[in-house]
C-alpha cells in the first residue's frame, strides 16, 4: 500500500471552510441529539484535537450549542454537547441547502491526486497468476494468450461469444488477478459547495486496517496515522447490466436531500467496471460508447453539476464489455476500432468439451 491519506491536525488542512464544517456539526446534532465531542469527531471523520474541538468552541461562542455534562471521558471530548434553539434555526437553514450529515468530504483536487497515486496502470499480471485465476475455466491457449496483454494494457476489453461460454466468469477472474490490493477512497467528495457521496457499502468492500472494531482508541489511532475521511477498500469490481442508462453515468442529484451520488464509473475508479449484456441496455450501444470515448482515450471524465458547471475527474477504470451479440450487430466498425482488445470466448472444441 503506497498511498496513505496524510493526517489532519488543523482545520485548514481539511481543504474545507470552517463555517461549512460548523454547519455539518449542527446538522448531525439536529438529527442525532446530544453527543460527546469524541462521538461527533467519529461521525464527521475528523480528529477531535485541533479540528473538532475548535469547531465546538466556535459554536459554543455563538451560543449555537451548549455543554450538557461529562460522560466520564478525558477533557472536552468527553463532554456531552447539545444544540440550542438558535442552533436548531441555523441547522434548518443549512438543511435547506443540503441534508448531507455524514463524514466530512474530501476536496475534488485531493481525490484526483489520490486516484493518480493509486493508479491501476502500474498493476501487471504474469502467466502464473493468470493460470491460477483461470484454472476453473477451460478454453483454448489462443484465448489465454490474448487475455494477458489485454489485462496488462489497462485499456478497454470487449468479450463476446455465445451465451454460457464463461464471459462473465472470465471478467470475474480478471478481478481476482489484478484487484488483490486495497485502495483508499473518500466517504464523500466536495466541489463548489456541493457534496458527492462516494463510498457505497453495496459496491465497496471495506479492507481491515488492523483494528477490527471501531472503538474510541482505535479511532484516535487512525486519526494519528492518516486522514479518517478516507476508507480503505478492496479495489472495486462493479457489474452493471440492462439497467444502465446515460443518466446513470453522470452525477445523480437527489432533489430532496440536495446532494449527489457518484456514478458507476467513479465508484469503480481503481478497479473494474463490467458492462454485462452489452447491447441490451436502455440506451443504444453507439450512444453508450460515444459517452466513453473521451474518458477511455484521455483517462479523464467530465461530470455535470445541476448548476451546469462541468467538473473533471480522473478516469482510472478497466472497462470490460461483455455481450452475447455479434459485435458488428451492435456498432459500426469505427466504434469497434476504439475498443482496444476484442476477444471471442467461443464454443469449446471437442477436446475441451470432453475435459469440461
Where does each model-flagged region fall?
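A short helix-turn-beta junction within AAA+ P-loop NTPase domains corresponding to the substrate/partner-engaging
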Residues: 331-347
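Conserved ASCE/P-loop NTPase catalytic core
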Residues: 135-320
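Interdomain "pre-motor" coupling segment immediately N-terminal to P-loop NTPase/helicase cores
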Residues: 53-123
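Dynamic helix-loop-helix/coil hinge segments at AAA+ ATPase domain boundaries and subdomain interfaces
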Residues: 116-144
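Short alpha-helical segments that sit at the start of domains
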Residues: 2-25
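Short acidic, hydrophobic short linear motifs in intrinsically disordered regions
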Residues: 31-46
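Conserved AAA+ ATPase "sensor/coupling" helix adjacent to the nucleotide-binding pocket
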Residues: 294-295, 338, 355-356
Amino acid at each position: 500500500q503506497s498511498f496513505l491519506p496524510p493526517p489532519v491536525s488543523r482545520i485548514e488542512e481539511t481543504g474545507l471552510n470552517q463555517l461549512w464544517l460548523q454547519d455539518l456539526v449542527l446538522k448531525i446534532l439536529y438529527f442525532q441529539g446530544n453527543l460527546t465531542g469524541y462521538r461527533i469527531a467519529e461521525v464527521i471523520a475528523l480528529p477531535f484535537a485541533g479540528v473538532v474541538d475548535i469547531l465546538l468552541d466556535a459554536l459554543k461562542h455563538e451560543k449555537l450549542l451548549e455543554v450538557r455534562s461529562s460522560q466520564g471521558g478525558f477533557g472536552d471530548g468527553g463532554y456531552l454537547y447539545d444544540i440550542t434553539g438558535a442552533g436548531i434555526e441555523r441547522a434548518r437553514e443549512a438543511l435547506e441547502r443540503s441534508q448531507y450529515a455524514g463524514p466530512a468530504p474530501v476536496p475534488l483536487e485531493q481525490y484526483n491526486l489520490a486516484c493518480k497515486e493509486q493508479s491501476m496502470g502500474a498493476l501487471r499480471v504474469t502467466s502464473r497468476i493468470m493460470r491460477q485465476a483461470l484454472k476453473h475455466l477451460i478454453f483454448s491457449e489462443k484465448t489465454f494468450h490474448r487475455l494477458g496483454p489485454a489485462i496488462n494494457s489497462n485499456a478497454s476489453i470487449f468479450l463476446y461469444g455465445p451465451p454460457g461460454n464463461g464471459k462473465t466468469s472470465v471478467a470475474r477472474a480478471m478481478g481476482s488477478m489484478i484487484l488483490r490490493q486495497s485502495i483508499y477512497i473518500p466517504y464523500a467528495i466536495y466541489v463548489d459547495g456541493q457534496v458527492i457521496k462516494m463510498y457505497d457499502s453495496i459496491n465497496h468492500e471495506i479492507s481491515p486496517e488492523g483494528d477490527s472494531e471501531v472503538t474510541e482508541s482505535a479511532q484516535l489511532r487512525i486519526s494519528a496515522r492518516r486522514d479518517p475521511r478516507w476508507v480503505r477498500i478492496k479495489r472495486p469490481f462493479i457489474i452493471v447490466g440492462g439497467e444502465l442508462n446515460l443518466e446513470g453515468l453522470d452525477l445523480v442529484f437527489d432533489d430532496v436531500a440536495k446532494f449527489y451520488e457518484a456514478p458507476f464509473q467513479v465508484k469503480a475508479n481503481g478497479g473494474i467496471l463490467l458492462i454485462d449484456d452489452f447491447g441490451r441496455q436502455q440506451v443504444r450501444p453507439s450512444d453508450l460508447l460515444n459517452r466513453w470515448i473521451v474518458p477511455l482515450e484521455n483517462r479523464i471524465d467530465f461530470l455535470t453539476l445541476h448548476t451546469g458547471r462541468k467538473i473533471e475527474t480522473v478516469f482510472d477504470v478497466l472497462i470490460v464489455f461483455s455481450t452475447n451479440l455479434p459485435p458488428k450487430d451492435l456498432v459500426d466498425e469505427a466504434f469497434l476500432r476504439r475498443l482496444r482488445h476484442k476477444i471471442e470466448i467461443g464454443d469449446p472444441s471437442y477436446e475441451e468439451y470432453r475435459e469440461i
